[in-house]
Amino acid sequence: MTIDTELTNGSSESVPFVFIGGGNMAAAIIKGCQNKGFTPKSNIVIGVQTEKSAEKWRQLGYKNVFTNTLEMLERYSTAIYVICVKPQVFEEVVSSWPVNSRPEFIISVMAGVPLKVLNAKLPFVSGNTTIVRLMPNVASSIGAGASTMCYEKNEKIMNQDSHIELAREFAECVGTVELIPERCFNPAMAIGGSSPAWTFMYIESLADGAVAQGLGRAEAKRLAAQAVLGAAQMVLNSNSGFDIETQHFGSLKDMVCSPGGTTIEGVRALEKNGFRYAVMEAVVAASTKADEMAKSLAK
């Protein structure tokens, strides 16, 4: 469907999505929007740094592609802006934004940049601007992402509820989305955003262990990946008999562990080597790093 966004002047018209940044995450989100029929290609505007990148987008059928951010933002003064760049270049984005701009709706897809910093660093943000933080993950590229979203409730902002609903639908184009308080954003982002890398390491380790015992590499990789996928589906699928809201993961583990069997022996080895502690520390480390990035940007 084409998105019709109610504007504060009372009119209703199709408003473009302006992506500031056209890297991997922007590509995943845009692809998801197209796959879900969320908004047409003609309604997508993309700002990139090089002509080579711009040409790649044009070859995919996107005509509204710019290498000059200021020119793009001046031309699209009424839009839903999606800041999809690395935090390190955020200041450059700010300096490229027209000072007389008064955006109504901004979606930030930047790790470690809190709402307070966004409000402070974007001097043109008015009291009528809805800012949403959104953090998808790499699985968004196949429509299986786990996104985290937060915003600051402000009843003075016209149409904020409709903006938030639109942001949720936008995020759901690439998977699931959890709306959470910002104080929980960094640990949630560590789980949703960073954990795929750790999960790849886990799958790789499973395969390596089997290869060490003589199993072929290809078979080991397929079995390991499918085992992890199946375990996740058992957690999320109510048909498995597991209730994620009320039951402990240990009940699923216990289903597999027979007394004196091979699985419980493997659990013992994992516990001996600090498996759970290592995973917990990875989440804490990623979350702490995001906190440090936020403090650095706030200076």
From Swiss-Prot:
Alphabetical list of Gene3D superfamilies matching this protein: NAD(P)-binding Rossmann-like Domain (3.40.50.720), ProC C-terminal domain-like (1.10.3730.10)
MF-aspect GO terms: pyrroline-5-carboxylate reductase activity
Q: Which reaction does it catalyse?
A: L-proline + NADP(+) = (S)-1-pyrroline-5-carboxylate + NADPH + 2 H(+); L-proline + NAD(+) = (S)-1-pyrroline-5-carboxylate + NADH + 2 H(+)
Q: Which Pfam families match?
A: F420_oxidored (PF03807), P5CR_dimer (PF14748)
- Would you identify the family this protein belongs to, as annotated? Belongs to the pyrroline-5-carboxylate reductase family.
Q: Which terms are listed as keywords in the entry?
A: Amino-acid biosynthesis, NADP, Oxidoreductase, Proline biosynthesis
Its annotated pathway reads: Amino-acid biosynthesis; L-proline biosynthesis; L-proline from L-glutamate 5-semialdehyde: step 1/1
Gene Ontology BP terms:
L-proline biosynthetic process
Organism name: Caenorhabditis elegans
* Alphabetized InterPro entries for the sequence: 6-PGluconate_DH-like_C_sf (IPR008927), NAD(P)-bd_dom_sf (IPR036291), P5C_Rdtase_cat_N (IPR028939), P5CR-like_CS (IPR053790), P5CR_dimer (IPR029036), Pyrroline-COOH_reductase (IPR000304)
Cross-referenced NCBIfam families: proC
| Coiled coil residues, start to end | none
- What is the main EC category here? oxidoreductase
- Annotated PANTHER family: PYRROLINE-5-CARBOXYLATE REDUCTASE, PYRROLINE-5-CARBOXYLATE REDUCTASE-RELATED
| UniProt EC number | 1.5.1.2
**Descriptive protein name:** Putative pyrroline-5-carboxylate reductase 4
